[in-house]
């Protein structure tokens, strides 16, 4: 009987179980079952059931000089959504992500009217910061929630928070209500972004995800230009409150499509028994330490050197709070290990930390050009706020279109590493050319250089998420996705303030050199759009040269960051979303 079963098992395993060579030794018990004659006869008569048990845990860990390498068996066939349903769900996701991204920039042209209506100039910084702080601080929270709760309902809850916050902002009777609404919207927006990328992993197979991720990533580039334009249009021709009202019908459409078409999936990890174990699994202690650490850091970056001097007690206290809480958070994460919000094993994975370094550098470069290209157009070319947005369109279109094309190419070819190598090379060249701007630079230069930089950025901007989705197991993808999006936000916040410091320092130096008779401090504080109004006409060329010098020094920071992104690509192993692997590139 044993020989008969062995022959039948080998014949059926060759025919239908090519993945058995990947199974761990522990999984053989599920093949042979209890050691009694009756069970062996039953299994011999039904060999097709053998492969049903190993689904997610068929992983071996090989220890070597390169670190832990996971060899996974090909998963069971998963029923992905049909094409028409994928398209409908993606349209819904894109609408919500676009609204969430627009909320980062749509108030840029509406804030003057808001402060005029509420008489709240002292609060205008919080209209943006409340949204940013809530969005950044909740990113890892959603990453943890998505491990234990169904992504469909986490997404709907986040959407309701975002829409509720938008409604509060739209009907706000005073500045405090507007700030509270912005914080609620940011809390929901964070969940929308993280959940959207996770939904992509559910509705399409891994080889098609780069295209979908590229589409979602391109929306951030689009919102960077159209946010201020849309905000200005609402403010001029209707009311600034429509900056928030517009989210309500769009959110309704998104919610309808997700509820109707997206099948509720099961959580990637099951709850343990016992209240204490459940609290430890959620990493409540780590989250309560991480959120104040992040908020303290962002407040230091926002207030240091502007609202308060760097040696002020407020700034020193915030730095101390950040230092203590971030160290405590690191200790808790090490203690929690696989239950941590950021598992140490994930950080030790060279594909993950390489992707995070790549994301950090590239996002820092992008935020610099998003902010300081319009400043160059307004100060040097005397463009209006609206026209500067129009002049920035070559960059935005290049990033958006190349992100989509890059995603399609990775989907078609399978390999993502070549595009990630191309990004720092092309983007740093484009950024370096942008730093050669002169006061006399004409259309061919500022259009062509923007396009070159945008192509470089677009080639790899969405690929770190592809690396995460191709590298991590099902129950850690949500945390990895949250970590990438958090890194993007932190890089933007940090290098925005670095760029501001470089700009102010170089502007004062250049003004002393070009126009020593002028009050450099007064001109620097006046702003880029009014320089022609506060100096004599014969001094305008000198002031413009000073502004051009200061802005192009900031561009050099962006170029350096784009080049530094190469350091993040080097440790990432050559892999394919189609399951292929180039061994020569693995070292």
Swiss-Prot record:
| Bilayer topology annotation | Multi-pass membrane protein
Query: What lineage is this protein's organism placed in?
Result: Eukaryota, Fungi, Dikarya, Ascomycota, Pezizomycotina
Glycosylation sites (chain numbering): 382
The protein here is known as: MFS-type transporter opaD
Give the InterPro entries listed for this entry.
Answer: MFS, MFS_dom, MFS_trans_sf
Q: Which gene encodes it?
A: opaD
SUPFAM superfamilies linked: MFS general substrate transporter
The record's subcellular location field reads: Membrane
Species of origin: Aspergillus ustus
GO CC list: plasma membrane
């Amino acid at each position: 009987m044993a020989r008969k079963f062995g022959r039948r098992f080998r014949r059926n395993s060759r025919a239908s179980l090519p993945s058995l060579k990947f199974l761990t030794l522990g999984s053989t018990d599920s093949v042979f079952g209890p050691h009694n004659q009756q069970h062996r006869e039953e299994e011999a008569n039904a060999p097709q059931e053998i492969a049903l048990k190993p689904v997610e845990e068929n992983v071996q860990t090989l220890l070597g000089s390169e670190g832990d390498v996971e060899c996974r068996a090909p998963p069971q066939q998963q029923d992905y959504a049909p094409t028409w349903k994928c398209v409908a769900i993606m349209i819904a996701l894109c609408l919500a992500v676009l609204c969430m991204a627009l909320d980062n920039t749509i108030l840029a042209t509406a804030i003057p009217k808001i402060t005029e209506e509420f008489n709240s100039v002292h609060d205008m910084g919080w209209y943006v910061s409340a949204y940013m702080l809530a969005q950044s601080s909740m990113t890892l929270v959603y990453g943890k929630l998505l491990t234990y709760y169904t992504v469909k309902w986490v997404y709907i809850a986040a959407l309701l928070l975002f829409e509720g916050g938008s409604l509060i902002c739209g009907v706000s009777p005073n500045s405090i209500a507007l700030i509270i609404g912005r914080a609620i919207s940011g809390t929901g927006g964070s969940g929308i972004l993280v959940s959207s990328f996770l939904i992509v992993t559910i509705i399409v197979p891994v080889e098609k995800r780069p295209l979908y991720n590229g589409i979602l990533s391109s929306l951030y580039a689009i919102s960077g230009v159209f946010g201020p334009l849309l905000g200005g249009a609402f403010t001029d021709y209707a009311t600034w409150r429509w900056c928030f009202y517009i989210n309500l019908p769009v959110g309704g459409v998104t919610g309808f499509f997700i509820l109707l078409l997206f099948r509720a999936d099961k959580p990637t990890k099951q709850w343990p028994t016992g209240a204490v174990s459940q609290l430890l699994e959620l990493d409540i202690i780590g989250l309560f330490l991480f959120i104040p650490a992040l908020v303290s850091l962002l407040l230091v970056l926002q207030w240091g050197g502007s609202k308060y001097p760097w040696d002020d007690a407020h700034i020193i206290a915030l730095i101390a709070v950040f230092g203590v809480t971030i160290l405590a958070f690191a200790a808790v994460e090490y203690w929690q290990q696989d239950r941590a919000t950021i598992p140490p094993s994930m950080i030790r994975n060279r594909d993950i930390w390489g992707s995070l370094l790549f994301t950090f550098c590239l996002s820092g470069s992008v935020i610099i050009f998003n902010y300081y290209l319009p400043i160059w157009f307004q100060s040097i070319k005397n463009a209006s706020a609206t026209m500067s947005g129009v002049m920035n369109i070559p960059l935005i279109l290049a990033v958006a279109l190349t992100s989509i094309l890059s995603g399609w190419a990775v989907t078609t070819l399978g390999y993502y590493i070549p595009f990630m190598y191309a990004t720092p090379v092309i983007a740093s060249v484009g950024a370096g050319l942008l730093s050669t701007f002169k006061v006399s630079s004409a259309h061919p230069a500022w259009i062509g250089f923007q396009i070159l930089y945008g192509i470089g950025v677009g080639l790899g901007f969405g690929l770190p998420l592809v690396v995460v989705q191709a590298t991590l197991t099902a129950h850690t993808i949500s945390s990895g996705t949250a970590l990438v999006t958090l890194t993007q936000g932190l890089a933007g916040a940090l290098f925005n303030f670095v760029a501001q410091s470089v700009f102010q320092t170089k502007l004062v130096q250049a003004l002393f050199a070009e126009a020593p008779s002028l009050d450099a401090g007064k001109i620097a504080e006046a702003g880029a759009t009014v320089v022609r109004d506060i100096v004599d006409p014969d001094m305008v060329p000198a002031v413009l040269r000073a502004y051009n010098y200061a802005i192009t020094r900031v561009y050099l920071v962006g170029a350096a960051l784009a080049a530094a992104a190469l350091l993040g690509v080097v440790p990432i192993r050559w892999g394919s979303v189609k399951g292929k692997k180039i061994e020569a590139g693995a070292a």
